[in-house]
């Protein structure tokens, strides 16, 4: 369907001007070309076409706007014409002439004339035929090019372009609407895509520069909108074909986990152990007793050698277990799990210092179970991880802000059920031998299906399986497997596997992975994971059953499946659980339930699909398969599989469904004449067998010639094409984007001009493509078979692409020359997102397999995704390989394809494929090369629509191929010498030719043209021009014995010249280009070549361009590369500095004694002088030699330079020692400065002896001085201070070093209320470690600032790119905002904190520089003038050998190169002191041997790889330099992975003989040899001679005493004088008042220094030091000098190449022995912990919960005692006595604890040593946080004591105690109230009330008591002077507490207890009872005596 608008003319225009038209329909606009100088009438005559996906509604509107075009200002609207399309929809074609309307809707005179046509596919609109349909798409070339590319530079015939036109058109091209994936019909004249698109931009730039007054053209407003949408580089000539399967190859991985601590563990009085599990490996921490917040700091390493897929699916599980011991497995407190892939996808592949949330898998309603703080890192081979510095780490108290969760995952995760519904499977293969089946059949007559399938599902470390369906190829389950896990889960994939149940061993039939990210969306408008019901296809090994299947791994999902195995209908749903629901099952056990069956039609209506293929060429067939006939089989699912299909699917009868009538076929008359009965069309799925013919010694080909065999297959699948169509549209956008980005990268790499314009074009195309997707993707909305995922995914994709289109549009406006690289990075993100979205998780049609078969055996295969072959009439929906000739390289299946076996091409096919509905079959031949006749299987009436079984080509074209093979570089070393004898073999069609063999080189220059004559290509000529066949180039190593060795392969496409084209620029002659050579999946060099395919016209070869090149008579028939293609050469001089050779290994067991170096480049070269005795002095006598050579003008084409070292032996023999190829001379090229440029001497960096220095020429000195004042700042900023100055200006750099006195005066002025921590540290208390820890704080602060600025910048970029987008905030941004808010809250001190916790001021301590990496990486390997070249010998190893280049290194050549054009400018040689013998290497030192004192300081090691079974190591240092070998075995550190060594070693060495220092860390073993953990190597010689002065670091300040004493034997003034002398710099001139002038720079600084006695004396050292610290600002010779530092070096183990085994912190000082001797080494021995004693008096408790019920009275009471410890419960637990029977919760103790401990103040850790177990050889040192634990318990006599509550006080920062029990609240401990924090190390004595907490049943904290305690800290000396007794003992005893009498034991004094128990409680009741008793007694007596008295009374007695 399409709407076509033909805009003819616009008339009645006023005035004269440039006009442009804009035509808009459905939001997509096209612009016409600009018509210049139109007066009255504008004759556009342009056609615009909109392919439309859905029918046009009669109410839709077409809008046309006419503008006056302005090249500078915005365009001015003339008028608008809007047309409702009602009539167009009814009549198909409408011609219109009408007037326009202006802005105010008034009619104006101007009128337009146009024609509108509408093509509807269903034929409902007017009469039309196929001609209409095709013809309109292929209008004549000019119109079509105007429509799509009319405004794109380079897209029009160059004859029509003038400079002015080019300028206007290019400026306007931003608005050109590129239609995505537009391919022209083959009938039209093709557009010249290869023409360089930049050629026509020159006029634009010229004009822009005039406009902008010499500004950069891209800063001018018009130029800044210029966009290029056609390729500039020739990337298309380099097809990217990967031969070797990369998936499934095992790799080395290391998972390292540090468990630091746990907090808030739920439970009372726990003994927690942390279990760390990766896959099936488990490791445990030590047990911590009776604590809810244990501290571990234990490091675990897990090593794996598996494929990436297996690795990333492994689950990391961190569990906390309570009371685990040898007998008990312990009870699980909680666990946390995450897959390895989630960790690997994090920045730096790690989580650092994050808190894992624990939850109980057995009780999902239980909530949070605690937190574990840990570091998790996953390292693959070669990964470089930046680990944050380990030392002096502070506690991250903000748990919520540092959770172990990926970005965007909410901290509150909910429990959810994952329902995996398994419905049924189809097409299962036979999984049993048929022998028994045949016996059964013979006896019983049964023929059973030979498979017993069931489905197993793996998710998040759990697995569940369905029931087994016995003997069924089409099993029906209708079951669901239910998993319960937290949502969102931290496991990315779910594995679904069909398995065959077997008595012995169940085997996998097929595996499918469900990526949860692809079936859900976590955005604001996202959706929960959902899938299906949908079919998923499973692939694996071939279907023939064998008992031992060598490809069984493929069925397990490892590697690419080579055959269709089965398809499974499944569904997935997620339900978030309400954990408060009491009916909910709380277990997370996997359950299997019955699922509701679904109807067959729910996955879509079954449709008949038709697959057609034509084999146009089969070449490069491996010679192993050349002796038997070969056939090719094509299968789709089980259809077409004739050999082992076995359970062939039955053809389903088409079912009529309601709505079928509406789905009229897209092309009405496509297959009317085909019958519908079964069997009307038998499938032909394989080609007839044919015996191959020989091509050359390696390969064969099948002689198809003009008869091309065809295959066709009918198959039936649910019609879910819409899914594939949408995926294809996105793939097209992504392909276009990738091509564009590659083009931009190539432009940047090859330094082509204006990459920013090309990037704008790329973004423009992306924006249009996204818009196109929105209009096309929303079809077929009402289909009943659409699943929920289909609907949600579509919405999600539409939102993403709409957003991406808008971002691309806004990003396009921001692309400038200086931002190209940044924006390119953002565009790469777009590409990743598009590829992710295009991957459809719900399969429909299975992939197509092409198998090469010989003798009925499957040999090699290729797999093509069905979506790539799917036909659609909408261009964007068409599969990228549908109806196209595709080149396929067949490969061996499974593991056979790994390694050298996979390097050989098994076969190369040129194959045409088409897949579509049978109804659309009319189009299946439309893309084939024209000129064929069809051969049918049967002849007769009504069979004309039958597909052909072969095609006979009658049209063929004659061509000649010229392969210009110039040179190759960095080839694979195939011989044991480390060199090769390479030749290249070029394959094209069925021919091959070889270049000559060049001996012993890795960089051959063949300079040879290979001519392939008599090439016959079938098809239309112009089709071959657009898409020529692929050329294969293979590089081999010629062996005198045996066959040639394969070295690598590359692919190319030739530039095609048709007979009617002129052989002239810009397309011809072709340019030489580099092609990447691959050997398997590894790169193996580059080939510099060009290829052209020339059509031979009617007059034969006479029309071809002549072969003219430099004829070399010596080369005989070999033709060189012709002039015009070969590079233009210029004369260059190559100067070589020969310094020396190092570490040469033996050759053939003989030592190298008299080596020589040969240098060769482009056939010319030079030899070094001979080293007469390598052992005595390995340096050369003659330092500099040179030779002249002709090199290409284009630096990218420079040939490599070869360095070879030979050993000269007796009788004139010499043997090769090793060689090195410098593949790029670029870094050694010297460019004379352009003195005409302003500020040339600051902007140009010169190469002096290959050391780039600023060149300072004669310069006029300005009169004014620039004063740069360097005020003292925060230490953080101090390190960053740089003074950037112009080299010609004078400057005063004022450096004020803060003087002690000023500081002291300031301190004195401070009031007494100031906090003690702000005091100036006492100089005598400071040591080197103070300096070290202060420096680490600074480094961390800098890193934090750097990260913050980095994230701010990224956010800013994201904001910019998303500018103008109105939409909800993404969840990622929300979570980030929440985290920031939380951080702010935590950082801001509360009102109550006041002076207690202000922002900690830094003490004034001098610092050094801590480098988190090697010093070499900071200073360019110290190769400022002396370079090191590794000499290699031996064959290059392959990946699977695990070999590295290290093993091939046989020595090193030290020297340098300088390459420059001759002649040099005279002023260079005229410079002062120029010595012609040294050429460009002026001022280099002598290379005579020199004696040096090397002093190595080893500070500490971190994260060492465990070497012992217990997961620890006993490390010690070993140092080797020359013959000196030091092993510090005695001082090994027991059971430590983070040892602090603090050692220095002095070694006397002689350079150059002893220059490679090796520092290793070994593991001490009691028995057996010690194991190497890792080592690092340092080249001392490069450091010694470097201009960066790496001998002894320059300190920050100059001191003559104290901890910061100056280490260098030379003072700063002496160093400065020497540097000035060596660099021939004027100075230093010291002046009064602390001034020094060096060259034209003046530095100022303090002029006095204080000695040890406090005496001040004048000095120039401070100011000299300030000059040294800014030496890089000195003109011409300035460079950064190495500061005083500590470097961090990775430790590597040769047995585990590429994986770090830990890191070592050290630094090296070197002092020449002929200079003054240095002072004593610095003392960096580890700080000894200081001995302290903590005295804790427990006075009272209050409000303690009452646990016991009284036996007699039922009254609540508690028998209270208090327990406390500091180091650990086993080590120093102390209990008070028991306060019995407390009725009020009050307890009185007056009890003293004494805790002696050793404390490291710098690390805030207690140090303790103890044996790890009874079997340990020695004590292990532990560092634990200084935390005092106080607990209250209820004592029980017979049962275990009951735990009531606890508080843990961090002695460095704990809440100040409340003055009274009433003021003491629970919030003090939970941190909800701002309480002043105190440190016992500062306060020394603290007394107060503290709350004691425990968790209740709801897992919430509750107050269980209060304790009054007094803490008193004393040093060991003070404690000795004032001793006190433990408990209430002497000396200084505490008085006994005055406890109430209730607090005794009742059975010792029952009367007393009765008195207390009864009288105190019930006295009033007792009194009432007594009174009542007396009254009753009285009444009883009265009654008793009443009768007597009455009788007496009556009787009167």
From Swiss-Prot:
Family per record: Belongs to the ferlin family.
Expression tissues: Isoform 1 is expressed in cochlea and brain. Expressed in the cochlear and vestibular hair cells. Expressed in both inner and outer hair cells (IHCs and OHCs) and cochlear ganglions neurons at postnatal day 2 (P2) and 6 (P6). Expressed only in IHCs at postnatal day 60 (P60) (at protein level). Strongly expressed in brain and inner ear. In the inner ear, it is mainly expressed in the cochlear IHC and vestibular type I sensory hair cells. Weakly expressed in eye, heart, skeletal muscle, liver, kidney, lung and testis.
Membrane topology of this protein: Single-pass type II membrane protein
Domain of life: Eukaryota
The entry's keywords: Calcium, Cell membrane, Cell projection, Coiled coil, Cytoplasmic vesicle, Deafness, Endoplasmic reticulum, Golgi apparatus, Hearing, Membrane, Metal-binding, Repeat, Signal-anchor, Synapse, Transmembrane, Transmembrane helix
Binding site for Ca(2+) 4: 1508, 1563, 1565, 1571
Binding positions for Ca(2+) 1 per the UniProt entry: 975, 981, 1037, 1039
Originating species: Mus musculus (Mouse)
Major subcellular site: membrane
Official protein name in the record: Otoferlin
Keyword Protease: no
Co-factor binding comment: Binds Ca(2+). The ions are bound to the C2 1 domain.
Binding site for Ca(2+) 5: 1836, 1839, 1842
Domain observations: The N-terminal first 124 residues can be classified as C2 domain, based on their 3D-structure. They are not sufficient for calcium ion or phospholipid binding.
């Amino acid at each position: 369907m399409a709407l076509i608008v033909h805009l003819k003319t616009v008339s009645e225009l006023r005035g004269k001007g440039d006009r442009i038209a804009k035509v808009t329909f459905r939001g997509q606009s096209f612009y016409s070309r600009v018509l210049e100088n139109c007066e009255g009438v504008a004759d556009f005559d342009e056609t615009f076409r909109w392919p439309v996906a859905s029918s046009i509604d009669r109410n839709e509107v077409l809008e046309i706007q006419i503008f006056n075009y302005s090249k500078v200002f915005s365009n001015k609207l003339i008028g608008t014409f809007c047309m409702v399309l009602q009539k167009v929809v009814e009549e198909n074609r409408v011609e219109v002439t009408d007037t326009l309307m202006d802005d105010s809707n008034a009619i104006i005179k101007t009128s337009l004339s146009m024609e509108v046509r509408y093509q509807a596919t269903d034929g409902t609109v007017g009469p039309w035929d196929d001609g209409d349909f095709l013809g309109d798409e292929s209008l004549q070339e000019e119109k079509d090019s105007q429509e799509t590319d009319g405004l794109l530079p380079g897209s029009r015939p160059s004859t029509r372009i003038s400079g002015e036109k080019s300028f206007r058109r290019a400026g306007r091209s931003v608005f050109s609407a590129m239609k995505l994936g537009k391919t022209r019909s083959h009938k039209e004249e093709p557009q010249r895509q290869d023409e360089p698109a930049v050629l026509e931009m020159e006029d634009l730039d010229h004009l822009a520069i005039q406009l902008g007054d010499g500004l950069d053209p891209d800063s001018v407003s018009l130029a800044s909108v210029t966009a290029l949408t056609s390729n500039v580089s020739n990337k298309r000539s380099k097809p990217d074909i990967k031969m070797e399967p990369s998936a499934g190859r095992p790799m080395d991985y290391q998972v390292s986990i540090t468990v630091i601590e746990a907090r808030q563990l739920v439970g009372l009085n726990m003994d927690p152990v942390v279990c760390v599990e990766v896959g099936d490996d488990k490791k445990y921490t030590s047990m911590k007793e009776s604590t809810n917040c244990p501290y571990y700091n234990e490091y675990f390493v897990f090593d794996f050698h598996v494929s990436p897929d297996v690795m990333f699916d492994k689950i990391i599980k961190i569990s906390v277990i309570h009371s685990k011991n040898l007998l008990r497995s312990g009870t699980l407190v909680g666990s946390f799990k995450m897959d390895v892939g989630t960790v690997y996808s994090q920045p730096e592949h790690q989580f650092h210092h994050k808190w894992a949330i624990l939850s109980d898998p057995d009780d999902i309603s239980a909530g949070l179970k605690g937190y574990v703080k840990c570091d998790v890192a996953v390292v693959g081979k070669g990964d470089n991880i930046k680990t944050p510095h380990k030392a002096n780490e502070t506690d991250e108290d903000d748990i919520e802000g540092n959770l172990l969760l990926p970005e965007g995952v909410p901290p509150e995760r909910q429990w959810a059920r994952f329902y995996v519904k398994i419905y049924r499977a189809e097409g299962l293969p036979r999984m049993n031998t048929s022998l028994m089946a045949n016996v059964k059949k013979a006896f019983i007559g049964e023929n059973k299906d030979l498979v017993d399938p069931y489905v197993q599902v793996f998710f998040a470390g759990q697995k569940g399986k369905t029931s087994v369906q016995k003997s069924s190829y089409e099993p029906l389950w209708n079951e669901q497997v239910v998993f319960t896990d937290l949502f969102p889960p931290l496991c990315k994939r779910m594995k679904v596997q069909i398995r065959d149940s077997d008595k012995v061993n169940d085997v996998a039939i097929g595996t499918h992975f469900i990526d949860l990210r692809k079936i859900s969306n976590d955005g604001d408008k996202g959706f929960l994971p959902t899938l299906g019901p949908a079919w998923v296809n499973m692939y694996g090994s071939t279907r023939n059953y064998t008992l031992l299947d060598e490809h069984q791994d493929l069925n397990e999902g490892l590697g690419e499946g080579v055959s269709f195995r089965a398809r499974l209908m499944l569904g997935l749903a997620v339900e978030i659980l309400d954990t408060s629901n009491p009916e909910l099952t709380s277990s997370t056990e996997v359950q299997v339930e019955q699922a509701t069956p679904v109807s067959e039609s729910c996955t879509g209506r079954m449709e008949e699909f038709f697959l057609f293929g034509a084999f146009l060429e089969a070449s490069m067939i491996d010679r192993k398969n050349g002796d038997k006939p070969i056939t090719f089989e094509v299968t789709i699912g089980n259809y077409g599989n004739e050999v082992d299909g076995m359970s062939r699917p039955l053809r389903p009868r088409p079912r009529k469904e309601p709505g079928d009538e509406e789905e009229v076929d897209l092309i009405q008359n496509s297959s009317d004449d085909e019958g519908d009965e079964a069997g009307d069309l038998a499938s032909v799925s394989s080609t007839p067998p044919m015996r191959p013919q020989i091509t050359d010694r390696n390969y064969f080909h099948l002689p198809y010639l003009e008869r091309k065999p065809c295959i066709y297959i009918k198959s039936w699948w649910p019609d879910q094409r819409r899914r594939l169509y949408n995926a294809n549209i996105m793939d097209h956008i992504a392909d276009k984007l990738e091509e564009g980005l590659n083009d931009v990268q190539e432009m940047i790499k090859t330094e082509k001009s204006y990459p920013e314009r090309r990037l704008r074009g790329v973004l423009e195309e992306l924006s249009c493509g996204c818009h196109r997707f929105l209009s096309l993707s929303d079809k077929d909305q009402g289909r009943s078979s659409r699943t929920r995922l289909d609907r949600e995914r579509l919405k999600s994709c539409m939102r993403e692409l709409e957003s991406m289109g808008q971002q691309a549009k806004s990003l396009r406006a921001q692309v400038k020359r200086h931002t190209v690289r940044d924006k390119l990075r953002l565009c790469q993100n777009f590409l990743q997102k598009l590829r992710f979205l295009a991957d459809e998780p719900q399969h429909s049609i299975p992939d197509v397999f092409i198998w090469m078969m010989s003798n009925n055996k499957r040999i090699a295969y290729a797999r093509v995704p069905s979506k790539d072959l799917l036909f659609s009439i909408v261009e964007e929906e068409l599969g990228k390989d549908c109806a196209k000739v595709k080149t396929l390289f067949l490969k061996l299946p499974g593991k056979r394809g790994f390694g050298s076996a996979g390097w050989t091409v098994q076969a190369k096919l040129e194959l045409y494929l088409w897949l579509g509905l049978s109804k659309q079959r009319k189009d299946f031949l439309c893309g084939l090369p024209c000129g064929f006749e069809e051969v049918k299987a049967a002849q007769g009436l009504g069979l004309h629509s039958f597909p052909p079984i072969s095609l006979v080509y009658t049209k063929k074209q004659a061509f000649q191929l010229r392969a210009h093979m110039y040179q190759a570089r960095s080839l694979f070393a195939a011989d044991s010498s480390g060199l090769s004898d390479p030749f290249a073999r070029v394959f094209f069609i069925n021919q091959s030719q070889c270049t000559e063999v060049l001996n012993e080189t890795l960089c051959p220059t063949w300079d040879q043209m290979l001519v392939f004559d008599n090439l016959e290509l079938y098809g239309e000529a112009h089709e071959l021009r657009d898409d020529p066949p692929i050329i294969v180039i293979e590089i081999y190593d010629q062996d005198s014995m045996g066959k040639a060795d394969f070295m690598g392969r590359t692919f190319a496409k030739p530039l095609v010249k048709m007979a009617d084209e002129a052989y002239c620029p810009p397309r011809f002659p072709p340019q030489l280009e580099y092609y990447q050579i691959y050997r398997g999946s590894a790169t193996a060099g580059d080939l510099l070549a060009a290829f052209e395919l020339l059509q031979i016209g009617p007059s034969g070869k006479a029309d071809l361009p002549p072969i003219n090149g430099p004829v070399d008579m010596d080369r005989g028939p070999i033709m060189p590369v012709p002039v015009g293609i070969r590079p233009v050469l210029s004369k260059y001089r190559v100067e070589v500095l020969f310094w020396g050779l190092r570490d040469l290994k033996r050759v053939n067991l003989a030592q190298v004694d008299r080596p020589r170096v040969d240098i060769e480049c482009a056939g010319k070269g030079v030899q070094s002088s001979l080293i007469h005795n390598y052992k005595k002095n390995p340096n050369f006598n003659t330092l500099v030699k040179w030779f002249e050579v002709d090199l290409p003008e284009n630096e990218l084409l420079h040939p490599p330079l070869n360095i070879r070292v030979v050993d000269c032996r007796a009788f004139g023999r010499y043997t090769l020692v090793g060689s090195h190829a410098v593949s790029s001379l670029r870094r050694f090229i010297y460019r004379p400065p352009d003195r005409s440029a302003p500020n040339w001497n600051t902007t140009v960096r010169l190469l002096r002896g290959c050391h780039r220095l600023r060149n300072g020429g004669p310069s006029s000195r300005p009169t004014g001085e620039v004063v740069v004042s360097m005020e003292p700042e925060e230490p953080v900023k101090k390190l960053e201070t740089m003074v950037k100055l112009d080299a010609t200006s004078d400057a005063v750099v004022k450096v004020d070093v803060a003087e002690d006195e000023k500081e002291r005066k300031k301190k004195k002025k401070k009031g007494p209320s100031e906090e003690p921590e702000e005091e100036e540290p006492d100089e005598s208390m400071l040591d080197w470690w103070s300096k070290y820890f202060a420096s680490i704080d600074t480094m961390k602060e800098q890193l934090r600032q750097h990260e913050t600025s980095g994230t701010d910048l990224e956010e800013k970029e994201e904001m910019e790119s998303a500018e103008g987008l109105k939409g909800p905030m993404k969840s990622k941004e929300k979570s980030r905002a929440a985290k920031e808010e939380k951080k702010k809250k935590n950082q801001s001190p509360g009102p109550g904190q006041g002076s207690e916790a202000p922002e900690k001021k830094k003490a004034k301590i001098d610092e050094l520089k801590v480098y988190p990496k090697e010093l070499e990486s900071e200073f360019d390997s110290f190769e400022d003038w002396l370079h090191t070249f590794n000499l290699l010998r031996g064959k290059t190893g392959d990946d699977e050998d695990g070999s590295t280049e290290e093993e091939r290194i046989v020595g090193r050549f030290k020297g340098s190169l300088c390459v420059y054009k001759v002649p040099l400018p005279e002023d260079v040689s005229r410079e002062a002191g120029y010595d012609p013998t040294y050429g460009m290497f002026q001022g280099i030192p002598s290379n005579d041997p020199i004696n040096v004192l090397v002093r190595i300081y080893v500070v500490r090691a971190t994260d060492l790889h465990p070497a012992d079974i217990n997961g620890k190591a006993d490390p010690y240092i070993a140092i080797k330099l020359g013959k000196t070998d030091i092993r510090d075995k005695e001082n090994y550190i027991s059971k430590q992975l983070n040892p602090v060594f603090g050692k220095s070693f002095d070694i006397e060495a002689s350079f150059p003989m002893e220059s490679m220092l090796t520092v290793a860390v070994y593991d001490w073993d009691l028995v057996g040899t010690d194991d190497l953990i890792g080592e690092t190597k340092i080249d001392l010689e490069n450091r010694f001679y470097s201009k960066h002065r790496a001998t002894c670091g320059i300190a920050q300040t100059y001191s003559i005493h104290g901890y910061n004493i100056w280490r260098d034997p030379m003072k700063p003034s002496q160093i400065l004088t020497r540097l000035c002398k060596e660099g021939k710099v004027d100075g230093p001139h010291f002046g009064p008042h602390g001034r020094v002038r060096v060259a034209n720079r003046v530095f100022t600084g303090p002029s006095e220094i204080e000695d040890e006695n406090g005496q001040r004396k004048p000095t120039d050292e401070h100011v000299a030091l300030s000059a040294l610290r800014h030496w890089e600002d000195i003109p011409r010779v300035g460079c950064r000098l190495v500061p005083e530092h500590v470097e961090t070096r990775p430790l590597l183990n040769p047995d585990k190449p590429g994986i770090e085994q830990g890191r070592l912190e050290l630094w090296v000082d070197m002092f020449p022995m002929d200079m003054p001797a240095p002072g004593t080494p610095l003392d960096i021995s580890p700080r000894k912990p200081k001995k302290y004693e903590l005295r804790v008096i427990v006075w009272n408790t209050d409000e303690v919960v009452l646990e016991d019920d009284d036996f007699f009275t039922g009254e609540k009471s508690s028998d209270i005692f208090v327990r406390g410890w500091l180091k650990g419960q086993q080590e120093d637990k102390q209990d008070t006595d028991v306060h019995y029977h407390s009725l009020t919760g009050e307890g009185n103790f007056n009890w003293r604890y004494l805790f002696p401990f050793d404390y490291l103040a710098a690390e805030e850790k207690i140090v303790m040593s103890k044996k790890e177990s009874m079997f340990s050889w020695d004590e292990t040192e532990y560092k634990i946080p200084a935390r005092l634990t106080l607990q209250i318990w209820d004592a029980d006599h017979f049962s275990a004591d009951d735990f009531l509550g606890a508080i843990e006080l961090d002695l460095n920062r704990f809440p100040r105690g409340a003055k009274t029990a009433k003021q003491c609240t629970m919030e003090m401990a939970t941190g909800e109230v701002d309480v002043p924090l105190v440190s016992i190390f500062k306060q020394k004595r603290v007394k107060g009330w503290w709350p004691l907490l425990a968790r209740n049943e709801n897992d919430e904290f509750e107050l269980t008591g209060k304790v009054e305690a007094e803490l008193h800290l004393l040093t060991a000396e003070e404690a000795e002077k004032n001793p006190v007794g433990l408990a209430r003992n002497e000396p200084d005893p505490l008085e006994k507490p005055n406890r109430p009498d209730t607090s005794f034991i009742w059975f010792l004094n029952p009367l007393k207890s009765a008195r207390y128990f009864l009288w105190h409680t019930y006295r009033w009741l007792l009194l009432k009872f007594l009174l009542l008793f007396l009254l009753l007694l009285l009444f009883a007596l009265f009654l008793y005596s009443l009768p007597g008295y009455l009788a007496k009374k009556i009787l009167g007695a």
